[in-house]
C-alpha cells in the first residue's frame, strides 16, 4: 500500500541538530547537505510512485523520498550499493540531507532499494514512462521557476555511456549466449547439455578463447552457431523465458545466415549491424565507433540553459538511448519533451553533429532557431559564392523558400522546379548583365530562352540558412557544455556505468544530472563556501562517521535510550 512520507512531523529530543553547538549547526546548514535537503529532497514527488504499489490495505511502503534521494546521491557521488548503505547509516551529512535527523531513525535496507528498482523497471517496460525521468523533470522545473532561470537559449551535447558489460569478441559472444541459453533449460536438460558440450559450457568464454589460434576461431564459430540453432528449438519447446529466446534469436540473426537445407553460414564482419547484440547480459547495448574508438552501451544527451543573463545555468533535460542513435534525433526528442513540460526554448546552440533533416524539421515545428558551431558536409569550391552568400526568405510553416536576394541586392521570388525538392529563381537580365560578378563568382546562370536563373535544392537552402546563423560567440557558448558533460560523467569511472540496461542507465543519468544542478545551486547560494562537494562527503572530521565525537555521542544516548518501537525515518513521515 502506498503512503507518502510526513516531512512535517515534530522532532524528538534526540534530533542530532539539538546536540550540536551553534557553530557546528551553522556549518551544517552551509553544507551541500542542507542545499540538497531544501532544493531537492523535499521536492521529490512521491505520488508518482503510487502506481507501483497495491491499492489494497496492506503494509505501507518504505519512504520513497529517502530511497529516491539516496539513489540520486549514489549516482552523483559514484557510490556502490555498499557505500550508499554505509553513508545512510553512519554519515551525518547524508542522513541530514535525507531527513534522517534522529539517531534512532532507520534507513531503508538494500533489499528495499532492489525492490523499488525492479518495480520502476517493470513499470517503464509496461508504460514507457521512466519515473526517475519524471522526478528529474518535476524538480528541475521547480528550480527553474524558483531561481528565475531563463530557458529560451539552450545548448546541447551528447556523450557516450559504457554499459557494465565485458568487451567480447564474436566467439566469446556466441559462447556466452550459448551458456546463458542453456541455463534457462530445465535442470535435467542443463546436465545433458553440460556433458555433451563440456568444451563450451565448463569454462568462461574468455578462458575458452584464450588459447585458441586464429585459424581455429572460424571453425568454432560455425560449431557454436549450429548449437545455438539447436538450442533455440529446445528453448521454444520447453517454454523458456521470452527474453532468453529473443536474445538467442537475435544473436543467430546478427552473426549468421540461415539458408534452407544447408549448414549455417557465418556473416562477414562488415555485414554485422551496430545494433547487434554486444552481450547477452545487456541486449539493449549497441555499438558506436566515434573518434577512432569503439563504444558499447548508450548515449546520453544533455540540454542546459545558457543565457548569459542567468546567474546559474541548469540542465533541463536528459535523454538516454542506444548509442547508434543520431544526435539529430536526440535533439528532436529533447525539444518534444521540453515543449510538453512547457519550457520555453527559442534557440539551441549545438555542434555540427546535430544538424540534419531530422533536427531542422523539429526546430521548425517548435519554432526554435538552430545555431550550430559547424556544419556537416562539403565546402563550396573556390571562386564561387556559397549558398550562404545569398539571403533567403523561408516560409515559417513549411520551410520552403519564398524569396532570394543576391549579394548585389537584387531580390526575386522563388518557384518550385519540375523535380522534387528543387527550386528556381529568375533574375532581371539587364541588371545581371551589368553585374561584374555575373559569369564569375555568382551562381546565377544565363539561359538561351529564359532570363538568368538560379537553380538550387531545398537542402542547399537549409544548410545556407544554418551557416548564416553561425557566429564566433556561438562557439564560446557551446564550449561550456564540455564542462557539463565532464561533471555529469565524473562519478562513473572511465565513463562506464555500474548498471546494465537502458532503463537503469537512464535512472543513473537522471540522478547524476540532478546532482550537477544541485552543485551549481549550492555554489550559487553559498558563493563564499570553501566546501568541495566532489571530494569528501562528510563535514570536517569532528562530524565524520568515525570521529570520536560521533562514537561518544551514539554511545551516550544508547546507554539510556531504549525505545520499544524504532520508527522508520520518523522525521520524514
Regions found by a protein language model. Name each.
Residues 52-64, 76-132, 148:
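Trp/Phe/Arg-rich N-terminal binding region typifying the photolyase-homology
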